[in-house]
Amino acid sequence: MRCKQRVRTTELVDGFRHSAPYVNAHRGKTFVVMLGGEALAQNQFRGILNDVALLHSLGIKVVLVYGARPQIDAALAANGIEPAYHDGVRITDEDSLKVIKQVAGALQFDITARLSMSLSNTPMQGAQINLVSGNFVIAQPLGVDNGVDFCLSGKVRRIDAQGLKRQLDNHCIVLMGPIAASVTGESFNLTAEEIATQVAIKLKADKMIGFSSQNGILDRNGDVIAELMPNDAQKILNKLAEQGSACIGTMAFLKASIDACRNGVPRCHLVSYLDDGALLQELFSREGIGTQIVTESAERLRRASISDIGGILNLIRPLEEQGILVRRSREQLEIEIEQFMLIERDGLVIGCAALYPFEEDNAGEFACLVVHPDYRDADRGSLLLKNIIGQARSRGYSRLFALTTRSIHWFLEHGFVIEDVDALPQKKKQLYNYQRRSKILALDL
């Protein structure tokens, strides 16, 4: 008998546990995944397709739209045909369309073959995926623009949403390429971004997902912007267009995301095709890894309720154990819960603060300010303070005070000044703990 030594690791267990809420949340939802030609040209595209298969196995309805921009350019050049563009849109003549059909067909076979694999010791073992393609998109010609004839370049005329839904309900992955037919029986070359956008809109998809060479949209410091509203995304798109330095695929998907969000798709995600597992990390972790363009923020600031007590206790308990916060019992929190504001992200309480009234002194106490350690990079504490200040002013308070042992400079940076114990309201002064020796700070409102 041979015994195998087993190494115990908590990473896999922790990963499963942390992803479980997202597995449950995504089950039965519809995702439109757009793989541009740039992504398909990378070795990592096999891993991406494995991850798409995993989404399918978790009960997610997947429409996979692929593009072929670099592959088409290379094939045209190999056939002695100069690629022609106008305003970033390909001009497709009859000779070009023949080549484009060959390229699109080859890519379709490659993707189908990869998603049909079920070898042992591979991520696709036992997958048994049914892949469906068809005439779900009806095209029409782009026509002539400013004297430029786009010939056989087309755009979406309509989407067979009911046909798509039937296939998705039958547990199929729908695969869609850049070639679509018109009502006259002609074939047209469309952009993958437009197909993905229109499919997502017509299906009322829950997400549209795209890939770029970067992990999303970067700010001026080179850091990934986690979340953008459509109007902010439009400003960034305009700036990127002026600079002319951004990847064509990135700009095209950003534009498509803005259009999709403005037409009812709640969230669009942009992740890197170079980062192995980026798709899964974006969808099944609270932090994500790329950029979301959203119609409504994943985070929201709201007043706490009784059901939030467990989340608040989990947030403040580590600081209580370190002696940074005064310990609060569950019973005390139940009594004081209406004084609390919190920041919630995907069901997790990631920040909280309280405003305790001292009406007889026309003052309020700013207390129990806590932000989760993983979310201290976006000035959420200032957001909570701003909200509490607004509440205090609306109640007519003239002063806001706070007690702290560790965050003196943070309060000073936000306009507070150091006071002595005698400056406290009488009731608070009677409860002051001289052993903790908390610093007293106040802000005139």
Curated annotation (Swiss-Prot):
The gene is argA. Gene3D superfamilies: 3.40.630.30, Acetylglutamate kinase-like (3.40.1160.10). The keyword Acyltransferase applies. One of its GO terms (biological process) is L-arginine biosynthetic process. CDD domains: AAK_NAGS-ABP, NAT_SF. It is an enzyme of class 2 (transferase). Belongs to the acetyltransferase family. ArgA subfamily. It is found in: Cytoplasm. One of its GO terms (cellular component) is cytoplasm. Pathway: Amino-acid biosynthesis; L-arginine biosynthesis; N(2)-acetyl-L-ornithine from L-glutamate: step 1/4. Its EC number is 2.3.1.1. Residues 299-445 form the N-acetyltransferase domain. GO terms for molecular function: L-glutamate N-acetyltransferase activity. Keywords: Acyltransferase, Amino-acid biosynthesis, Arginine biosynthesis, Cytoplasm, Transferase. In bacteria which possess the bifunctional enzyme ornithine acetyltransferase/N-acetylglutamate synthase (ArgJ), ArgA fulfills an anaplerotic role. This is Amino-acid acetyltransferase. It catalyses: L-glutamate + acetyl-CoA = N-acetyl-L-glutamate + CoA + H(+).
